[in-house]
Amino acid sequence: MIQEQLAHLLEFLPDYRPFPPVKEHTAWQGLPLRAKQRFLQAGEAALQTPIAPLPLSLWLDFTHTGRRTPWETAYFSRRARLCALVSAECVEHKGRFLDEIADTVWAICEESAWQLPAHNSYVRDTPQLPLPDTTRPIVDLFAAETGALLALTRYLLPDELDTAAPGITARMERELDARILTPYFTSHFWWMGNGEEPMCNWTSWCTQNVLLTVFLLPTTQQQRKAAVKQAAYSLDCFLKDYGADGCCNEGAQYYRHAGLTLWGCLEILSNVAPEAFRPLFRETKIKNIAEYICNVHVEGPYYLNFGDCSPLAGRCGAREYRFGQAVGSDALQALAAADFRADADPDHLQNPDGSTHINLWYRLTTAFAEQELMEYAAVPQHRSAVWYPSVGIYAARQGSWVLGAKFGSNGDSHNHNDTGSITVYKDGRPFLIDIGVESYTKKTFSPQRYEIWTMQSAWHNLPTFDGVQQLPGAEYACLLYTSPSPRD
């Protein structure tokens, strides 16, 4: 689907300009007052918060104990700090935050590795190496996030940064070339796609952030064309694992990192090459992927959940709204706008998985869409029943009740042994629950995964016969004698 569009590429690929640089300050002054106040409040709090240290002992804590939280808490706090400081400087533009921005940028550039300890391996699903090899950078989810963050920081404040710390933007460009661009163009990471090998949210998520890095930096036309070609291949590998119905087998929480980052990729590609990639938003499969989140939404903050997904999968906002606009979905725009207005934390500063509050592009996309979101008046509507045959997910509503049923198999990404399980809500509140997953550790994505009690069928809404529980694998599936029929 995506690679077919390469035939329509023009010779020149321009910069991606999602927002004006800060020196074009009129647009920033025109942001809603509420957004500017949030940014300044977060930036001022960051000024009072020192840069978190990342000593070797924190990395080795994962190596020795398998705990992810100690390293990741400090790692994410650095990037959240930079997001807050840059956002504040963008709306104020008086230089008050520049020294701390430069300090934080420098600290991130000085890190030995941008990948997480939990992702420190070169071959998919193999044990992590005890220490990073600084001569062979790994582009994982958060190396790619870091690349996009630094690239956007440099794009927004190039002159200001070099005034505060002469030469710092050149350092940023060198690090981005060494840690993101060169590895991407010269190595093969599993998430880039490999024929029929199954992909997951890593593919669209990493690709989105690499594309941001490529098109926000002063890269060559050769690099840009190579990135577009690789991205098209990777996204086709990603899309092959989706059925025509658009169901995300990783659940609502991972839609934010899968379907929404697919939108991110297409947003970037359709801006730098509209004649080639904008028509993709008219594809029925892309629209179905976009609207999945509407169909598993229960009410308020709750979503039908299975596998590793939490029932509190995060509020919708600007990205969902823009995806809805792109594919022509009134339902998605209405849900996104209503959810945004109900969200006490629209910048997701308290996001529990640490992955949205470090993304500056998401934060600024929200600010520049905020006025539209506040004014969009349509009321969200839910379908009475939805059946996703590609994954085996059924959702139905009757009166005050909402039912979610997981058919399908135990071979999903982020799988639990939960085929046949159900969840129920009454009056918008949990009635029969799926507890989701505990904090990730080294064991979570290892051969010992199903030793963890939350992964086992006995801890889901399922029977256990004579002490025998379900087993993992696509061959362990629910047999349907009559398929549910969706009713509109």
Identify what each model region corresponds to.
Residues 1-33:
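Extreme N-terminal leader/anchor segments
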Residues 81-95, 145-164, 206-221, 260-275, ...:
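Well-ordered alpha-helical scaffold segments within catalytic/enzyme domains
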Residues 43-54, 101-119, 168-193, 226-246, ...:
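Long, well-ordered core segments of solenoidal/helical folds
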Residues 65-78, 90, 127-144, 186-204, ...:
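Solvent-exposed loop and edge beta-strand segments that line ligand/cofactor-binding
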Residues 481-488:
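Conserved small/polar residues in nucleotide/adenosyl-binding loops
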Residues 417-480:
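Active-site rim segments in enzyme catalytic domains, especially the processed small/beta chain
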Residues 129-253:
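Active-site lining segments of carbohydrate-active enzymes
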Residues 259-431:
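Carbohydrate-active enzyme catalytic cores, enriched for enzymes
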